Design a protein with these regions (language model features):
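Active-site neighborhoods and metal-handling regions in enzymes and metal-associated proteins
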Residues: 1-193
Length: 193
């Protein structure tokens, strides 16, 4: 069964209203494209290499947004490095997702981590979610210092790196900002098969 159809079937069986957006299931030949089109594949998924599964659900009117990275088979050292860099950026940037920290600080940290390895993330580090899939604020270096994380916000944390030869890696979790830090409310991770 197509992975996109499987997700939609399972979410409806579990009380969700619908997907938050069209599910992206990009295998190794297309995972480098960030938002590959079409979002589904009729080939083996996941194939050997790096794949991305980006999906969201709507539950009680609110939208989630998550991305899993799937590593299947034996990877090259360069592919392993992409996985490690994205995981490192996710771990480090999560520490910046707290009350009164400028959102741009988190994105600057991710860019710094990637730049040390001559890599660049071609999108923002995250965005608000709620009734809509993309809400204020964008976790971007273009935001001003007065735009800060505040309790009650739910913000995605989605570091990603993409290489046409190696494939793409993105980890995306939804993070609730609390009065004393944050709570990761989704459970995306790198899955090894």
């Amino acid at each position: 069964m197509d992975v996109s159809l499987l997700i939609e079937k399972e979410l409806r069986l579990n009380g969700c209203e619908r997907t938050g957006f069209d599910t992206l299931a990009a295998g190794p030949a297309r995972s480098w494209a960030i938002h590959a089109f079409p979002g589904y594949t009729n080939g083996e998924w996941p194939g050997n290499g790096l794949s991305i599964l980006d999906f969201g659900v709507v539950y009680n009117g609110y939208t989630s947004d998550t991305t899993l990275a799937v590593a299947k088979g034996e990877l090259s050292p360069e592919q392993e490095k992409l996985l490690a860099l994205v995981q490192h950026a996710a771990d480090e940037c999560l520490r910046r997702y707290k009350k009164d920290v400028p959102v741009k600080d988190a994105c600057e940290l991710a860019e710094k981590i990637f730049a040390k390895e001559n890599r660049k993330m071609p999108h923002t580090l995250g965005h608000g979610i709620g009734l809509e899939i993309h809400e204020f604020p964008r976790v971007s270096t273009k935001m001003t210092a007065d735009v800060t994380f505040q309790p009650g916000m739910i913000i995605t944390l989605e570091p990603g790196l993409y290489d046409e030869k190696l494939g793409g890696v993105r980890l995306e979790n939804d993070v609730l900002i609390t009065a004393d830090g944050n709570e990761v409310i989704t459970h995306s991770r790198i899955i090894r098969l």
